[in-house]
From Swiss-Prot:
This is Isovaleryl-homoserine lactone synthase. One of its GO terms (molecular function) is acyltransferase activity, transferring groups other than amino-acyl groups. It catalyses: 3-methylbutanoyl-CoA + S-adenosyl-L-methionine = N-isovaleryl-L-homoserine lactone + S-methyl-5'-thioadenosine + CoA + H(+). SUPFAM superfamilies: Acyl-CoA N-acyltransferases (Nat).
């Protein structure tokens, strides 16, 4: 199952989150050579890992085998702060119904395709359940055929550019019941996301983030 982890239930997953930060460092720094992310403690953590982040992590027992994260675009996001030039045509989203999707990873021994489909289903399922309409992402262009094959509806926000020697783009992905139904059929599971502990209201949290950001600007 893919576990949804947020501020309201992270006390149940502290060991899992720590393991996942170290896996991110192994994959994005040691394997993919994103040297700007290197940290001496071997944990890949950035400004978008905070109390408003939602992690969707694939667990086998307590072992993390894959995952990704969501972040409210009503706060300064990776796209708006680091890569706004990639969204120069349509602009960076800032909406409680649009969350930024990033740090997608799968451990080496599970890169057979099956877990990828489960992780793609998870973002659709979690967002549909929460009333989120779209996710935004900074992604390498080679993701486009993968998303198309999974039935994702992708809208570019600007022109691609080279980032870390890879052609990279900004886009939104629609959250659609039809897409999720097809993915559920393909993975052979009627549901893939598990939310233990208190239930998160992601849209309400994003609205609060937006209010706080507006107050800081007007102060």
């Amino acid at each position: 199952m893919i576990h949804a982890i947020s501020a309201v239930n992270r006390h149940l997953y502290e060991d899992v989150l720590e393991q996942h930060f170290r896996l991110r460092h192994d994959i994005f720094v040691e394997e993919r050579h994103w040297e700007t992310l290197r940290r001496p403690d071997g944990r890949e953590v950035d400004s978008y890992d905070d109390e408003d982040t939602v992690y969707l992590l694939a667990l086998e027992g307590r072992r993390v085998v894959g995952g990704h994260r969501l972040y409210p675009t009503t706060k300064p996001s990776m796209m708006s702060e680091v890569f706004p030039h990639l969204a120069a045509v349509r602009g960076c989203p800032s909406d409680p119904l649009i969350w930024e999707w990033s740090r997608y990873f799968v451990v080496r021994d599970r890169r057979d395709g099956a877990l990828n489909l489960q992780l793609m289903a998870a973002v659709q399922e979690f967002c549909l359940d929460q009333g989120i309409a779209q996710v935004s992402a900074i992604m390498e262009t080679w993701w486009l055929p993968r998303f198309h094959e999974a039935g994702f509806v992708v809208t570019p926000l600007g022109l691609p550019a080279l980032v870390e020697n890879a052609w990279t783009m900004a886009a939104t992905v629609d959250i659609r019941r039809q897409t999720l139904d097809v993915l559920h059929d393909r993975i052979g599971m009627p549901s893939i996301v598990q939310q233990d502990g208190p239930r998160l209201d992601a849209v309400a949290r994003a609205n609060l983030c937006g209010l706080a950001a507006a107050q800081r600007k007007s102060a």
